[in-house]
Swiss-Prot record:
Catalytic activity field: L-glutamyl-tRNA(Gln) + L-glutamine + ATP + H2O = L-glutaminyl-tRNA(Gln) + L-glutamate + ADP + phosphate + H(+); L-aspartyl-tRNA(Asn) + L-glutamine + ATP + H2O = L-asparaginyl-tRNA(Asn) + L-glutamate + ADP + phosphate + 2 H(+)
Protein name listed in UniProt: Aspartyl/glutamyl-tRNA(Asn/Gln) amidotransferase subunit B
UniProt keywords, alphabetically: ATP-binding, Ligase, Nucleotide-binding, Protein biosynthesis
Domain of life: Bacteria
Listed InterPro entries: Asn/Gln-tRNA_amidoTrfase_suB/E, Asn/Gln-tRNA_Trfase_suB/E_cat, Asn/Gln_amidotransferase, Asn/Gln_tRNA_amidoTrase-B-like, GatB, GatB_C_1, GatB_Yqey_C_2, Gln-tRNA_amidoTrfase_suB_CS
Assembly description: Heterotrimer of A, B and C subunits.
Organism per entry: Rhodospirillum centenum (strain ATCC 51521 / SW)
Length: 484
């Protein structure tokens, strides 16, 4: 169903494009040998190149180029064998050279595509316009001193991939799905860790509104939004603001805006620059970047199985629904965990335990699968205990809760607590006789035609045996006894 804003003059459509700045996983910066570790002491990872000392020349880091090419291949994008680095000129205190090295007209990666998995089970393609390499700026710290701004250049020179989407998204939910899918692909590839809270993946949000079928409206760009939730909120607020502005007789100005999460609103930051404002020109210190097709082919051979392919395989090989397969492949570690659990077992039962029980429990405590106290082999062991009749499904829930708390193996918990399923027909006979004796009136009702009471008797017997009785045996013996 289309996402439309109901204005006073009719329905308005949102047009969304996203520019994602993804920090490249690399031990060194794009043009210097300085380290890139997060959380280092201020200005402790800065080379003379990063600080723009006179006479210092940039030398390209091949690993960063390889990571960009790998990402382009993961996005099914065109890899340009010749690309050019340009100087993007602007002044800011945390940009010591007075320019950023970026790629303007000839990026390393061209058109690509991402397939979104939406909440209603449908999919949608979003085009990738380009991916280019550039260096990050430093960081200005305004909250360290009442009257001074401090500058930390640790981030200056760190390699970024700017991944620019086409304006193909039409709702905040699609934008969120795009960011989640892009982050998943980057993590599968190992080219960016996607940690938005650390700033290694940041998003600029381009929003415009129009009446359905009309030309694109004037867009605004909301800079450096650092969580998927904030991206959704910024889109909702900005689209509503533009509709109200236009319907009130105003005009949307092409400008750069800032998202204020405390107030839940965007606010004007500066007028939006055009490309000519930056006076782009090829960097005279860097030759055009030329790569060989054979090198690209070698990188392609090293690509892992990507989320879309893995999802299709899970559906085909394991018989999983698109929804369950989508949840399992959303994180590479999660998919690997599931495959270990499912090996040699009922794949749908394994999916139920991983998604319904384990992920549900981890989500409540804000943990992901890599922090699970239950190992994949141990969860598989719990499933084995249920399928071979050692414990009942009811007891399995108690064992699972204990595993979650202690990390102990399921077999040890079962033995220690005496939870083995009761298959002794004599013991089950006795429990049934006691339940029937205590509920003689209900036995009479059952025998007079109230067969729905059968479930009541099963529940009473299971309670009497503390859930340990074999359900199939209980059903069989109980049915015989109740018939008299």
């Amino acid at each position: 169903m289309a996402y439309l804003i109901q204005g006073e003059t009719g329905e308005w459509e949102i047009v969304i494009g996203l520019e994602v700045h993804a920090q490249v996983i690399s031990n060194a910066k794009l043009f210097s040998g300085a380290a890139t570790a997060f959380g280092a002491a201020p200005n402790s990872q800065v080379s003379f190149v990063d600080a723009a000392f006179p006479g210092m020349l940039p030398v390209i880091n091949e690993v960063c180029v390889e990571q960009a090419v790998k990402t382009g291949l993961g996005l099914k994008a065109q890899i340009n064998l010749r690309s050019v680095f340009d100087r993007k000129n602007y002044f800011y205190a945390d940009l010591p050279a007075g320019y950023q090295i970026s790629q303007f007209q000839q990026p390393v990666v061209g058109n690509g595509t991402i397939v979104l998995d939406l909440a209603d089970g449908s999919t949608r393609e979003v085009g990738i316009e380009r991916l280019h390499l550039e260096i990050d700026a430093g960081k200005s710290l305004h909250d360290q001193h009442p009257s001074k701004t401090y500058v930390d250049l640790n981030r200056a020179g760190v390699a970024l991939m700017e991944i620019v989407s086409k304006p193909d998204m039409r709702s905040p939910e699609e934008a969120a799905a795009y960011l989640r899918k892009l982050r998943t692909i980057l993590r599968y590839l190992g080219t960016c860790d996607g940690n938005m809270e650390e700033g290694s993946m940041r998003c600029d949000v381009n929003v415009s509104v129009r009446k359905v079928g009309q030309p694109y409206g004037t867009r605004t760009e909301t800079k450096n939004v650092n969580s998927i939730r904030y991206v959704q909120q910024a889109i909702e607020y900005e689209a509503q603001r533009q509709v109200e502005l236009i319907e009130g007789g105003g005009t949307v100005v092409q400008e750069t805006r800032l998202w204020d999460p405390n107030k839940g609103e965007t606010r004007s930051m500066r007028s939006k620059e055009e490309a000519h404002d930056y006076r782009y020109f090829p960097d005279p210190d860097l030759l055009p970047l030329e790569i060989e097709q054979s090198w690209v082919d070698r990188i392609k051979e090293t690509l892992p199985e990507l989320p879309d392919d893995k999802k299709a395989r899970f559906m085909a090989d394991y018989g999983l629904s698109a929804y369950d397969a989508g949840i399992l492949v959303a994180e590479r570690a999660r998919a690997d965990f599931y495959e270990t659990v499912a090996k040699g077992r009922d794949p749908k039962l394994a999916a139920n335990y991983v998604i319904g029980d384990l992920l549900g429990a981890l989500n409540k405590t804000g943990r992901d699968i890599t922090e699970s106290p239950i190992a994949a082999d141990d969860l598989g062991g719990l499933i084995d205990l249920v399928t071979d009749g050692t414990i009942s499904g009811r007891i399995a829930k108690d064992v699972f809760a204990e595993m979650l708390e202690t990390g102990e193996k399921p077999s040890l918990i079962v033995e220690k607590k005496g939870l083995r399923q009761v298959t002794d027909t004599g013991a089950i006979d006795k429990a049934i006789d006691e339940v029937m004796a205590a509920n003689a009136d209900k036995v009479a009702e059952f025998r007079s035609g109230k067969e729905k009471l059968f479930g009541f008797f099963v529940g009473q017997v299971m309670r009497a045996t503390q859930g340990k009785a074999n359900p199939a045996l209980v059903n069989e013996i109980l049915a015989t006894k109740l018939k008299g």
